[in-house]
Amino acid sequence: MATDGASCEPDFSRAPEDAAGATAEAAKQDFDVDALSKSELRMLLSVMEGELEARDLVIEALRARRKEVFIQERYGRFNLNDPFLALQRDYEAGAGDKEKKPVCANPLSILEAVMAHCRKMQERMSTQLAAAESRQKKLEMEKLQLQALELEHKKLAARLEEERGKNKHVVLMLVKECKQLSGRVIEEAQKLEDVMAKLDEEKKKTSALEEELSTEKRRSTDMEAQMEKQLSEFDTEREQLRAKLHREEAHTADLKEEIDKMKKMIEQLKRGSDSKPSLSLPRKTKDRRLVSISVGTEGPMTRSVACQTDPVIESTDHVKKLPLTVPVKPSTGSPLVSANAKGNACTSAALVRPGIDRQASHGDLIGSSLPTVPPPSATRVEENGPSTDSAPDLTNSTPPVPSSTAPPAMQTPGAAPQSHSQAPLHSLHSPSANASLHPGLNPRIQAARFRFQGNANDPDQNGNTTQSPPSRDVSPTSRDNLVAKQLARNTVTQALSRFTGPPAGAPPRHGVPPSGDVGTYPPVGRTNVKTPGVARVDRGNPPPIPPKKPGLSQAPSPPHPQLKVVMDSSRAPSAGAKVDNKTVASPPSSLPPGNRVINEENLPKPTTPQLPPKPSIDLTVAPAGCAVSALATSQVGAWPAETPGLNQPACSERSLVIPTTIAFCSSINPVSASSCRAGASDSLLVTASGWSPSLTFLLMSGGPAPLAGRPTLLQQAAAQGNVTLLSMLLNEEGLDINYSCEDGHSALYSAAKNGHTDCVRLLLNAEAQVDAADKNGFTPLCAAAAQGHFKCVELLTAYDADINHTADGGQTPLYLACKNGNKECIKLLLEAGSDRSVKTSDGWTPLHAAVDTGNVDSVKLLMYHSAPARGHFLHEEEPESGVCGLDGGEGSPEGTAKPVVPADLINQADREGWTAAHIAASKGFKNCLEILCRHAGLEPDRREKCNRTVHDVATDDCKHLLENLHAFKIPLRISVGEVQPDIYCSDDFECENTICILNIRKQTSWDDFSKAVSQALTNHFQAISSDGWWSLEDVTCNNTADSSIGLGASSVRSVTLGNVPWSVGQSFAQSPWDFLRKNKAEQVSVLLSGPQEGCLSSVTYASLIPLQVLQNYLRLVEQYHNVIFHGPEGSLQNYIAHQLALCMKHRQIAAGFSCEIVRAQVDASFSKEQLADLFISSACLIPVKQSPVNKKIIIILENLEKSSMSELLGDFLAPLENRSPESPCTFHKGNGTSGCYYFHEHCFLMGTVAKACLQGSDLLVQQHFRWVQLRWDGEPMQSLLPRFLRRRAVNKFRGQVPSPCDPGCKAVDWAAAVWRQLNSCLTRLGTPEALLGPKYFLSCPVIPGHAQVTVKWMCKLWNAVIAPRVQEAILSRASVERHAGFAQTTAKKTPSQGQQAVVKAALSILLNKAVLHGCPLPRAELDQHTADFKGGSFPLSIVSSYNCCSKKKGENGTWRKVSTSPRKKSGHFSSPTWNKPDLNEEGIRNTTTSQLNCNRNASLSKQKSLENDLSSTLTLDQKLYLGSDDEADLIKELQSMCSSKSESDISKIADSRDDLRRFDSSRNNPTFSATVNNLRMPVSEKEVSPLSSHQTTECNDSKSKTESGVSRVKSFLPVPQSKATLCSQNTKRSSSSSNTRQIEINNNSKEEIWNLHKNEQVEKPNK
């Protein structure tokens, strides 16, 4: 039957083939396959394929059915479990019932079929086994190949090390050459410094010699001046004696003449003549001989023009009739002054006050031919400076006066006729005229002039004058004598002028203050010509350059003679008025018109005891009302500065004075100002000058003198600030104190304009008119306000001056003060209640004037200063209601107070339609415009007459201000929502960061607002994710959709405007301006998508880990279920795990699953039973009999490094991989029970390990988890810290990317560099357990403009975190090596001295190399912080002085201590961190320290030096030893710390000497040597920079020769000191955890020994 079944199978197997063939034949008959299209072919193939599949199914079904029928028929009656029993039953049944036939043909065939099947299966299994064996053999062959490759790799590695050694040797040679070159450079620099020092010394010597030379010059000048002074005094005395002789001779001649006359009179009396009434005695007529000729109101008068060398011209008067017996003496007149000369005379003023000649009778005057009086148009003197068409001649100008205006000379008997044109007329500006203006004139010379000019009228002790004989009738002899005596007197004056004037050709000196001044004047508008030879040296002034000798001087006589008026009819013709012989001259034309009154205090001399001490005044020409001087004894105030004021002069448009007369009997020479009646009686001046009062009666003997000249003098005193003179004039009765000149200037006006407060007070007390205006309408208050005299303004307002008075042009005092920017005056006027709204004729208000000048303070006062109650500000210097803080400080009023001016005044337009804002904008006064814009009522859209707005006329800066005028500034901030990372301190992490300030204007639309928000976010993300300090322009130019960290506008979840939610692109009915104002939104907050939305954008922004990296981590967790994050401590492992768990939780919740997060802190006491309970309680471990729960669990095991992971997780590794009920495991609970459990399929396990690398048994766990390594030198950790600190800086700068030059930015870059350099050094040091993540540096403070705070923070971090970790890592490594080397069971509680030395050396290296390198602080500031760092004072030369000797001989390595100053004790290097155990005697004996004598003292043996060392205090810093060889490996680690990777940095370190900080524990400490005999490892190049920061001195042994001893400073390169053979063959291998490569060096290798210290001295030790 088996054969039948077998035969049937082929039939069925062929059935599908037959069917397919039939179908194909039918298809060929029906259609042609080649003619079908592609779609029809596809359809045909699919139909045929379906038929084939259906046929196969039918065949299989028929076969199965046939097989079932066959078995049922054959074995249906039997149990087929055991075929042998069935076979036995068949036989039994067959024996019993032979008639029955068995169903099966042969049961044995069935058994054979079964056995054949078994054999087939056995063959198949053998085949598979053979294949497995072949695979195993192949695997073994691969292993052999791998071993061969490893051997080859080792060979290559060894060859590579050899090449590195060769390269290192080459580098050492190059470094040696570099060091030599650097030494040469230092020598050249030292030479250059010496040369520069010598040059400085030479310069100092030269300057000292120059000072001595100048001192000698001054001394010689003083001596020469004194000699000149003595010569001039001698000349003066000679001329005095000569003049006295001439006077005596003249007097003798007069007496003879008088005798003759008396004889004639006796004869006449005898004859009984009737002429007695007409011949009166001189004493009777003496009091009537002084004639005062009035001007302006009287009839025409002749002018007498004469020089002292010219014939005398008689002048007559037709108006004032005198008796016939009164003769009038011809007087010396004033020269005519040209129209272009500066003067101050009124138009109709005659300039001469003629005296009375006793020799001429009235009949002679009448009988004489009278000259024609020139018309006013011809004699008028131009006022207020020269005319526009002619300028004054400064040398020798002759005025263009027509000959008809000159009075003809009268012919007198005996007098030579001389025309007026022959007299040289000089301008007042000529140097010759100026030459006689000598305020510093020698008092003896002045006395001589007084003596010769007024000796006949000198008062005696009783105040009486010497009297002359009575007058005689006119005779030719007397006229001749008159001319002769006049010539004699002129000759004396000419002689005196020769040495009182300057040398010929000497120009006048401008701006030199007179030595006799008491008041201090600025040199504005001032010119004074001093006599160089006789300056007042007692005032402290340096002696001037001496003039030429008077005897050699060729200066001509003064062309403008002294004007003298005869006072007494009884005088001799040769006697003149007693006046101060000082010629009046005007200043040069370059000066502004103004009276110059120069105070000179003349001290009495022993040679002239008859002259009492009296002040003398020289008057120069200036406009009346503008003279600014006073008596030296009564000077009040200072010369007012030349400030912008009124456009017109003080008096009128043309107002200058011509000096015409000299006051009688006084040292004061007043100029007649605006009046020609200055010749009136000056009794007040006589009294003021200190002369006897009896002279007043004598001077006024001609009758009562009118007060017409008094107002002029009053104005002069007020303008000059002469308080004494002014008070005397005010006490005079009948004086009109309100008198004003032609221009309307009163005395009060002049005093107020020139700022003489005391004069203003005197005039106001005298009831002067306070509001008297000039012809232009300006009052004294206007003048004071315009000139800025706020004291005068205060006085005038106190006396109820009209503060709102308007001049002819509408100018008020407030307007004038604003126009000139006088802040104090504006303040006083506003407090007095001045009206701000008064307009001028041009429509300008005071606000227009203030803005026009651009004075911000004036504008602020007008805008914000309110007027207090009237009358309370007079005695308050600073009213409390006034404006404070005009400089814009914290007290600035515009920030708190509201403007007091109305909107109408702000928008007031002038005649052209311009407002104050138009003026400020057009002139570019941005500050003024900003103040105006703060007023709510300002209308910037107001148009002027040309239809232009403020914006149209504004400059670019002002346009920008106007465009942002009404911008609503609102901050845009980013919020990270619920992301509150536990890795950040609360103070270090900002939940919200201000990224920019949005300017919302009225015309801003919602589309613009959306674009602005999106653009701001994009720029911010680009800025914080960039590699450097990008500016916003760079960010905009580099604009992309997303930043490098994956954030963009799509990362925003929502935006809130204040408290109202808003999304980008959304619009409201109101504009953004109105919406934000209405809702009082203070900020715009942007919330990023976070884990709640199943997104990681907020986590990316908070941690600054790129979004793609976080998404990759999340994918790993979801895919592998078991993930561990590991990295150095502080690498944010816990934070990343927690945030990923949150994101997964919210994703599962969104998918409809419940999810739970379980966090567990693992410590050393955490057992696997507790972990099992945790898994069971969180439904992570499920009992076998229990069905799994429908929720997902996320378990986070934090800090797994604190326990043994192999012990803790060992029992859970297999169940974690096979999570199903089929593979349960038995776990023990914490309560002692146990059970079978399996892990939930949807359980996620995450762990965190704060360890850089795994060691030992923990490696067994590694293959069962997916590990995510967070390396400090790879992404994402490498860029996290710079990005985080950069974002903090942007937040501190209010969203603006700061400049890289900012100290705060430099501190940020430095902090990030410290973190990288520190980890780099720790890696090479072989202490990976001391590596730090960026967490500790995230708290770095960022303060704009300051870096000191960052340095202090770094010091605290170093002392609290970094230094303890480094110490612990190095000591733990040392203890591990000690345990491995000597199998010690107990570790020392305190580290050995060698270990402490290694720790200190490591800290010093790290501090100098990693932390302080590149600090942004200057060297001086950084030195102040170095003492606060731990480990910065360790002498690194000790590290390299360790000698490694053979272990077999039992010799220990020693620390050699060398001190150049054995008297100095220890303590130069402080190390407060570690304990210093006292060394016992045995330990001391074990130390074989030897002292090397730098002074070549070879007599001391090593034993004595050792005993000397032991007798002194033994400290850890100076005397260190190593008791075993394990410290040698640590020293080896230190020396090879910077071996290979830092070779390229040596040039960088050597060049950046400013960045390299050296820390000396003491500036004057003895330094240490580094003499090395045997050392196994060289010091690498990069180790140089920190090691060279300590002062060491190289000392040789007693036989070596030291070099010059000059220390070479500022050397950054190590110098190989000696070649030494290294005796150690066996070097210890470092632990497996060390990343530092150790090199085995044989006995014959030679290495360079590095000498590393600050002051390097290269010495060659004896071999």
From Swiss-Prot:
- PROSITE patterns per UniProt: ANK_REP_REGION, ANK_REPEAT
Give the Polar residues compositional bias ranges. Answer: 385-396, 418-435, 1586-1595
Single GO cellular component annotation?
FAR/SIN/STRIPAK complex
Q: Which residues carry this modification: Asymmetric dimethylarginine?
A: R498
Write out the ranges of the annotated region (Disordered).
1-26, 203-225, 359-440, 454-478, 497-615, 1449-1490, 1579-1663
The parts of the chain that form a coiled coil are 119-276
- List where Low complexity composition bias occurs: 1624-1638
Keyword Phosphoprotein present in the record's keywords: the answer is yes
One Pfam entry name: Ank
- Primary site of residence: cytoplasm
Extent of Pro residues compositional bias: 606-615
Q: Where are the ANK repeats?
A: 709-739, 743-772, 776-805, 809-838, 842-871, 912-942
Among InterPro entries, the record links this protein to:
Ankyrin_rpt, Ankyrin_rpt-contain_sf, Cortactin-binding_p2_N
Q: Which UniProt keywords apply?
A: ANK repeat, Cell projection, Coiled coil, Cytoplasm, Methylation, Phosphoprotein, Repeat, Synapse
The chain residues annotated with the modification Phosphoserine are S1524
Against Gene3D superfamilies, the record matches this protein to: Ankyrin repeat-containing domain
Which PANTHER family does UniProt cross-reference here?
ANKYRIN REPEAT AND SOCS BOX CONTAINING 3, SI:CH211-189E2.2
Function recorded in the entry: Regulates the dendritic spine distribution of CTTN/cortactin in hippocampal neurons, and thus controls dendritic spinogenesis and dendritic spine maintenance. Associates with the striatin-interacting phosphatase and kinase (STRIPAK) core complex to regulate dendritic spine distribution of the STRIPAK complex in hippocampal neurons.
Q: How does it assemble?
A: Interacts with CTTN/cortactin SH3 domain. Interacts with STRN, STRN4/zinedin and MOB4/phocein; this interactions mediate the association with the STRIPAK core complex and may regulate dendritic spine distribution of the STRIPAK complex in hippocampal neurons. Activation of glutamate receptors weakens the interaction with STRN and STRN4.
Query: What's the name of the protein?
Result: Cortactin-binding protein 2
- Look up and give the organism this protein is from: Rhinolophus ferrumequinum
Gene, per the UniProt record: CTTNBP2
